């Protein structure tokens, strides 16, 4: 097998002789783009990378047109981790943290005590779905596995890794009865693929996906599907920032500009882009003129 040149993608695979499917994700450039915009401490960067990998795996597995949002919240040193990924596989992520409370060797329970994980699916068509569970696990891989134990009948396991500026993830899921109808045989198959995935070593995560999957499952009939590219893309814009000002009402928007010394700044928490609006910009907004794309923005 040849190594794939792509750096950011998901790839689905199935076991031809077993009722099991998998999904692999690799995030290099998109993860690097998120980290380049924020000086996250390593424990925060690691958790955010793992959450990006998990979000990508779910988008690849669910196949929908819309937006998938994952939020992990707590009252601890990391009050928020948030990742959004669209059906077109545009991904962005951010974190809020208390820098003086982040220990390099802190566990998930110490960084996000009494935390909750919320999954939101906002489809272009259809009903919005949201589910919340406790962050129940020693790491995010266990938390996502436990989430699916509570919400689905099908066995599902996650493996997540974010080290060396690369985020990776593996999802395995048992499918409804088809090829294997004997319950004991199904359980043996599931334990077989799980046991092999558990042999993954930290240094192996950076390898090409085809190489790694072949090493794990070379004795099984595994069929890989086409890769689906991912990219970092922030959905913020000057127009959206202007709409936020309009939502305040004309009087409050003008007052805000005055209180800010003649120019209000709206920052994107995902990509750190800053949008500035002065009195003339606000007047133009409420006159129905929209936003001037030539006005000042900064990274």
UniProtKB/Swiss-Prot annotation:
It is found in: Cytoplasm. One of its GO terms (biological process) is protein refolding. One of its GO terms (molecular function) is protein folding chaperone. One of its GO terms (cellular component) is cytoplasm. Keywords: Chaperone, Cytoplasm, Disulfide bond, Redox-active center, Zinc. It comes from the Bacteria. It holds the Pfam family HSP33. Disulfide bonds join 234-236, 268-271. InterPro entries: Heat_shock_Hsp33 (IPR000397), Heat_shock_Hsp33_C (IPR016154), Heat_shock_Hsp33_N (IPR016153), Hsp33_helix_hairpin_bin_dom_sf (IPR023212). Gene3D superfamilies: helix hairpin bin (1.10.287.480), Hsp33 domain (3.55.30.10), HSP33 redox switch-like (3.90.1280.10). Under oxidizing conditions two disulfide bonds are formed involving the reactive cysteines. Under reducing conditions zinc is bound to the reactive cysteines and the protein is inactive. PANTHER family: 33 KDA CHAPERONIN. Redox regulated molecular chaperone. Protects both thermally unfolding and oxidatively damaged proteins from irreversible aggregation. Plays an important role in the bacterial defense system toward oxidative stress. Belongs to the HSP33 family. NCBIfam families: PRK00114.1. This is 33 kDa chaperonin. The gene is hslO.
């Amino acid at each position: 097998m040849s190594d794939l040149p792509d750096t950011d993608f998901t790839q689905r695979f199935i076991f031809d002789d077993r009722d099991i499917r998998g999904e692999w994700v690799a995030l290099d450039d998109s993860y690097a783009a998120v980290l380049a915009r924020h000086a996250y401490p390593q424990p925060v960067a690691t958790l955010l990378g793992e959450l990006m990998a998990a979000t990508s795996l779910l988008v690849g597995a669910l196949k929908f047109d819309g937006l998938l949002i994952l939020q992990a919240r707590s009252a601890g040193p990391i009050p928020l981790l948030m990742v959004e990924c669209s059906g077109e596989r545009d991904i962005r992520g951010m974190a809020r943290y208390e820098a003086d409370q982040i220990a390099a060797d802190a566990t998930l329970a110490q960084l996000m005590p009494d935390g909750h994980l919320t999954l939101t699916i906002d489809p272009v068509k259809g009903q919005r779905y949201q589910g919340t569970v406790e962050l129940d696990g020693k790491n995010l891989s266990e938390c996502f596995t436990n989430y699916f134990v509570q919400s689905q009948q099908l066995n599902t396991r996650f493996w997540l890794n974010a080290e060396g500026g690369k985020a990776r993830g593996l999802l395995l899921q048992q499918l409804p009865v088809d090829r294997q109808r004997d319950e004991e045989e199904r359980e043996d198959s599931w334990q077989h693929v799980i046991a092999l995935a558990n042999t993954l070593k930290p240094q192996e995560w950076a390898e090409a996906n085809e190489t790694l999957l072949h090493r794990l499952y070379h004795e099984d009939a595994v069929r890989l599907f086409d890769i689906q590219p991912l990219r970092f893309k922030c959905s913020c814009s000057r127009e959206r920032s202007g709409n936020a000002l309009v939502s305040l009402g004309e009087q409050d928007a003008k007052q805000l500009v005055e209180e800010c010394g003649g120019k209000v700044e709206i920052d994107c928490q995902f990509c750190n882009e800053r949008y500035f609006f002065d009195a003339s910009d606000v007047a133009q907004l409420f006159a129905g003129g929209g936003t001037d794309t030539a006005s000042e923005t900064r990274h």
